[in-house]
Amino acid sequence: MDKRAMLGAIGLAFGLMAWPFGASAKEKSMVWNEQWKTPSFVSGSLLKGEDAPEELVYRYLDQEKNTFQLGGQARERLSLIGKQTDELGHTVMRFEQRYRGIPVYGAVLVAHVNDGELSSLSGTLIPNLDKRTLKTEAAISIQQAEMIAKQDVADAVTKERPAAEEGKPTRLVIYPDGETPRLAYEVNVRFLTPVPGNWIYMIDAADGKVLNKWNQMDEAKPGGGQPVAGTSTVGVGRGVLGDQKYINTTYSSYYGYYYLQDNTRGSGIFTYDGRNRTVLPGSLWADVDNQFFASYDAAAVDAHYYAGVVYDYYKNVHGRLSYDGSNAAIRSTVHYGRGYNNAFWNGSQMVYGDGDGQTFLPFSGGIDVVGHELTHAVTDYTAGLVYQNESGAINEAMSDIFGTLVEFYANRNPDWEIGEDIYTPGIAGDALRSMSDPAKYGDPDHYSKRYTGTQDNGGVHTNSGIINKAAYLLSQGGVHYGVSVTGIGRDKMGKIFYRALVYYLTPTSNFSQLRAACVQAAADLYGSTSQEVNSVKQAFNAVGVY
């Protein structure tokens, strides 16, 4: 069994270099995308003015048209898709590149404006689309594209026609297929049986060819499930590892049951019984006496309790209200399938298998596993990292990082291992992955050792070890490959990676862009000449990411 694939880019394969930018190299810096010959991260005093924040972005891009090569006025090439004010008072905007009204897949630009000054741009835009022979009318229909994707799933993934669920609507995009952008359909095929999947297909709109495909289990959409009316109460039960926990429940006098429904956090935390079937969400967990000590209860106790801990961590440490930032309800189903050796975020809720008792215990028994999977939901609502190649490895690393930080926050025998509480119960000291020593379980701890094949969506669970090691070194310090890193502690490390994830990364960010994002996040939080900034640079140097 491949441990690395248990917890669950685009072929842009970015190579990046840092260069001084503009007349004042001391004030401005840039990470350069070698493939597209355009910037992917620019920071410094870029442009000042009294215009609306988005107008500053348009003006700057127009002034630097020879650098960004958009081929026209920026306001005609970019669509503002998000605007917010962060905790530092910065106006943070997300723009999506368009070509004749059609979205360019993965081409998202994040801009920061502070006190009337444009201070950073993050994200890769595809240049000179007007100079290419790009079609904007499809030769095949949406229905044909969807049939092609579903048939490929049946042929290559499930070996039978899956029972498809509603996924994201199919849409036309300009897809950067290597160095040749093409008009394509983005098709989402989502299913639970015979095995769970959430596949993204890029189908050539001219001839129906499959340009790319990957399993992105973590695409988000609003969840379902109905709460019960009743009185908030506190129950008690025993978790997977035998520890006692107090849990928030709801008593319904109408039904005469206590339900695993926590009304004290956001829009609620709900835990369901899958009854060893593969239908979601199952039944809202009910109990007659508010005491959950049966062995069958254990997985539900942990799923419910740990979901509350994750909610509290993001709220109390980062000021984030649930995974979407707007207090979305958190729903979990336990006892999914029979002996199912995995856990996943299916786009609307958490799903936990019971494990087979030998390789895995019930997955909800690992607090870092719960934190890991719910962080995928946070990523979906922020950077939206494509679950393939380096962007996918960053996606996985973010979940490992914050799953571990949740474990330390709860102070439940915390360590830098992933999944150690529920993996191979008969083997002491074993885990799925290690942040402190990725090589312990066969994962790379330096960019020179990265996996470059196509398995595991391009090594998302493998190459995450490189970023995990950088995060560990940033927190704890140490010497790695001859590079000395001064540790700044877990709290500051978490703040930096959170800010990079939420306010700087884009769907196709790679490791070099992550480095630039973390450097900028540290500068925002602690100052550009701070030890924290130096430590970020040291940590990424130590793992060979520049």
UniProtKB/Swiss-Prot annotation:
Give the active-site positions: E373, H461 (proton donor)
Where, by residue number, does Ca(2+) 3 bind?
Answer: N413, D415, E420
User: What's the EC number here?
Assistant: 3.4.24.27
Keywords (alphabetical) are: Calcium, Hydrolase, Metal-binding, Metalloprotease, Protease, Secreted, Signal, Zinc, Zymogen
Biological processes annotated in GO: proteolysis
The superkingdom of the source organism is Bacteria
- Activity's thermal dependence: Thermostable.
A GO MF term: metal ion binding
Tell me which family the UniProt entry assigns to this protein: Belongs to the peptidase M4 family.
The name of this protein is: Thermolysin
The gene name reads npr
